[in-house]
From Swiss-Prot:
It comes from the Bacteria. The gene is moaD. Pathway: Cofactor biosynthesis; molybdopterin biosynthesis. Belongs to the MoaD family. C-terminal thiocarboxylation occurs in 2 steps, it is first acyl-adenylated (-COAMP) by MoeB, then thiocarboxylated (-COSH) by IscS. GO terms for cellular component: molybdopterin adenylyltransferase complex. This is Molybdopterin synthase sulfur carrier subunit. The keyword Iron does not apply. The modification Glycyl adenylate is found at residue 77.
Length: 77
């Protein structure tokens, strides 16, 4: 299982802050594409990704037991 954590507007759009996917391996790009399709998360393309509390680059490999945080851009003043 790979645990996905969603924050801010992404969590609101998905209706949940945490999702578990039953995969042994995936890339961060595959996870984002899957969530975009399943939950209609259009703004996921601009989100930052962290795996096990460390920011990663696009298309990073993720394994079962990892936690992936998807953090949308924050704006405000």
């Amino acid at each position: 299982m790979i645990k996905i954590l969603l924050f801010a507007g992404l969590a609101e759009q998905a209706g949940t802050q945490a999702i578990e996917i039953d995969m042994e391996q995936a890339t961060t790009d595959e996870i984002k594409a899957s969530l975009k399709e399943q939950y209609g998360l259009e703004s996921i393309d601009t989100a930052m990704i962290a795996v096990n509390e460390s920011y990663v680059k696009e298309n990073t490999s993720v394994s079962s037991g990892d936690t992936v945080a998807i953090i949308p851009p924050v704006s405000g003043g």
